[in-house]
C-alpha cells in the first residue's frame, strides 16, 4: 500500500498560473520576445509532467494558454467602434477636417495681445504682430457662404449710419456746450439728437426732434439781434464805447469794444495810468499793446473821458428826438431842476470847506499838541475855529 500510494501521488503541486513560477513570470514580462521559445518549452514540459495527475485535479484548474495580448499592452485595450461609442479613444486621434474653421487663422490682430493680456501664446488663433499676420484665401466668401439675414440687416444699418455721418458734421463742428444746453432746455433725446437709435422708440419720455432745427432758431435770433445793433451803430458813427454798451443793454447781445489799427481792444481806462515797468526799466514787453501809458505824452484824462462817455450814453438814450439844450432844460421837471441846483450847491460848499481848512495854521489848531509848545504862562491869542 505504501508503494501504490507513493506511485499515485503527484511529484509536485501545480501553481495556479499553469506551471509558471514567479521568476519565470518576471523574466517573461521583462523580455517577452527573447523568452518566447523558453516559455513554450517550459509550457510543454509542465504539461508532460502534469499528465499523470490530471485525473485528481478539478476541471477549472487547467493550464492557462499563452496569449499574445499578455505581451502586447497596447492590444489589450478595446478599439473604439461605431457600435461601441463608450469605448476609450485611441492615443492618436485622426486629423480633424479644418473646413471653414481655420481659413481666418491669424488673419486679424489679437486685441488681447495689444493690451498685453493674451494667455494663449503661440496657440492663439489671432496674429501677434504684423509679421505673424496672414491673408485669407481669395475665395473665402464662397467657402463661408452667404451670411444670415440678421447680419445683412446690421450691415445695412451700418451703411445708413455712414451715409448720415456727413449730415452730422455741422453738429460736431458747433460748440458742444451749446448743444448740451439746447438738449437740456428743450428736453430732447440725446441718442436721437446724435444719430443713434433710441431703444425706447415712441415710448421715450424725451422729444425726438432734430437738433439742427433748434440750433437754426437760436442762430436766427442772434442774427436779427446783431443786425439791429449794427444798424444802430451805423446811424451814429461818432458814438464811443459807452454808447455801444448802452445799445448792448437794449439788445442783450455782446458787442466788442472799439479797436485800434493793431487789433487791440481799447477799454474805458485805456492809457489812463502810467506803466510801472516802463517807468522803472524803460522797456515794456507789451509795447504798443500795453493798456498803460508809456510816458506823459500817452497819458489820457480818465475823468474827462468818463464824462464824455456819460454824455454819449445820454445821447444814445434820446437818439430818436434831438432836443436843444435850452428846450431840454425847460422841459425838465421842477423837482429835477431843484435837485440839480441843490447838488451843485453841496459841491460848492464842500470845496469852500476844503479851501477854508487848507491853511496849516488853522489845521494845527484842531489838535491839542500846540498847547505843549507854548511857554509856561502864555496863552493863545487866536481862538480855535470850529
Swiss-Prot record:
UniProt-annotated stretches for the region Disordered: 1-90, 136-166
Biased composition (Basic and acidic residues): 151-166
Keyword ATP-binding: no
Biased amino acid composition, Polar residues: 20-37, 72-85
Keyword list, A-Z: DNA-binding, Metal-binding, Repeat, Zinc, Zinc-finger
Molecular function per GO: DNA binding; DNA-binding transcription factor activity; mRNA binding; zinc ion binding
Coiled-coil positions: none
Biased composition (Low complexity): 43-58
Alphabetized InterPro entries for the sequence: ZFP36-like, Znf_CCCH, Znf_CCCH_sf
Zinc finger (C3H1-type) in chain: 104-131, 183-211, 269-297
Keyword Zinc-finger: yes
PROSITE patterns xref list: ZF_C3H1 (PS50103)
GO BP annotation list: regulation of DNA-templated transcription
SMART domains: ZnF_C3H1
SUPFAM superfamilies listed in its UniProt record: CCCH zinc finger (SSF90229)
A Pfam family annotated for this UniProt entry: zf-CCCH_UNK
The protein's name: Zinc finger CCCH domain-containing protein 39
Lineage: Eukaryota, Viridiplantae, Streptophyta, Embryophyta, Tracheophyta
